[in-house]
């Protein structure tokens, strides 16, 4: 089983993943059917969210970072968390405003994700790895 961390949103902090030496990849959720998603989630979930659930199940993905960019991703997180199959599942709330309070909360949320990445990868954060990814 791969230790690759998958992500479903362009707002995922890839430099942070790189800083912890994580292998990561974007999901490419193109599903031929939604049989799994329709068994484990509400039928009215959008097609993209169903495709994410299908890809996770069909590909055996066990490490995923989601963001709260839309309500459907919150439901995907709920379904995957309830499944008990995920080794690493994180939800990163992305702020929709830029106020001192939202910036402070986002900093705490990034710290929580960083702590989880450190536990999952077993590595310390390396700023050079993060920077190398950022400038590539």
Locate each region found by the language model:
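An N-terminal assembly and electron-transfer interface module characteristic of large anaerobic redox
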Residues: 1-136
């Amino acid at each position: 089983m791969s230790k690759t961390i998958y992500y479903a949103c362009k707002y995922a902090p890839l430099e942070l993943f790189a800083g912890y030496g994580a292998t990561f990849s974007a999901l490419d959720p193109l599903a031929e059917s939604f049989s799994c998603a329709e068994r484990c989630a509400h039928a009215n979930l959008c097609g993209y969210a169903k495709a994410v659930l299908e890809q996770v199940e069909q590909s055996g993905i066990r490490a995923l970072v989601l963001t709260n960019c839309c309500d459907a991703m919150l439901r995907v997180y709920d379904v995957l968390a309830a499944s008990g199959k995920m080794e690493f599942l994180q939800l990163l709330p992305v702020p929709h405003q830029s106020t001192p309070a939202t910036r402070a909360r986002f900093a705490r949320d990034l710290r929580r994700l960083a702590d989880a990445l450190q536990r999952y990868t077993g590595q310390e954060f390396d700023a050079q790895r993060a920077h190398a990814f950022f400038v590539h």
